[in-house]
Amino acid sequence: MGVTCVSQVPLAEGKSVQQTVEILTRKLEQLGAEKQGTFYVDCETYHTAGASMGTPGQAGKLLYVMHNSEYPLSTFALFENGPCLVADLNLDVLMVKLKGFFQNAKANKMETRGTRYQYCDFLVKIGTVTVGQSGRGITVEVDYCPCAVPGDCWNLMMEFMQSFMGSHAPSVPPVFSAKHDPLYTPADTMVQYMELLNKIRKQQVTVAGMR
């Protein structure tokens, strides 16, 4: 586990989601990156009822329960603007038993799946975001494996991302500056995915509202 940056890449002009993914993967392969299997990250949204939590009249909060194929024995639970809980897979069973407090918004389940690439000390994952069977966007995750302190390797990561993302290379993730502990953790990656998937979800809602 190194330092990870998760970002969204817009569709290339006149291209579909799949065609844009192919453009990105072609650039990676031209650099010399090699395929290293596949990956997925999923995110289920749960609503908390204010009344059931002992606060009548208060709007419910959102809880995101997430999984990452890099950590197959773990489940991540994140509150909006809150802490990230890392648990084992029994948390999924517990959520079913807590349905009186947390209601699963099944229509809002999102996931990103794609191919992993290895390039020197970098691991790159390019994924297609889907809701149901509908493609909604593209995620790019870049891991710099030898380092665990974001401030020590960000410039190198940025230079590498620009080599295949061009002007779409991201700025410093907010989670880096929000950390109290200088060491990067898997929870920081899940926070980035949660924020990005929410952003993509809201983009779709906005587009639908304009039609």
From Swiss-Prot:
Organism domain of life: Eukaryota
Cell location: Nucleus
Main localisation: nucleus
Parts forming coiled coils: none
Single GO BP term: regulation of transcription by RNA polymerase II
GO cellular component terms, A-Z: mediator complex
Alphabetical UniProt keywords: Activator, Nucleus, Transcription, Transcription regulation
MF terms in GO: transcription coactivator activity
Subunit structure: Component of the Mediator complex.
Family in the record: Belongs to the Mediator complex subunit 20 family.
Function: Component of the Mediator complex, a coactivator involved in the regulated transcription of nearly all RNA polymerase II-dependent genes. Mediator functions as a bridge to convey information from gene-specific regulatory proteins to the basal RNA polymerase II transcription machinery. Mediator is recruited to promoters by direct interactions with regulatory proteins and serves as a scaffold for the assembly of a functional preinitiation complex with RNA polymerase II and the general transcription factors.
Protein name (record): Mediator of RNA polymerase II transcription subunit 20
Organism the protein comes from: Xenopus laevis
Protein encoded by which gene: med20
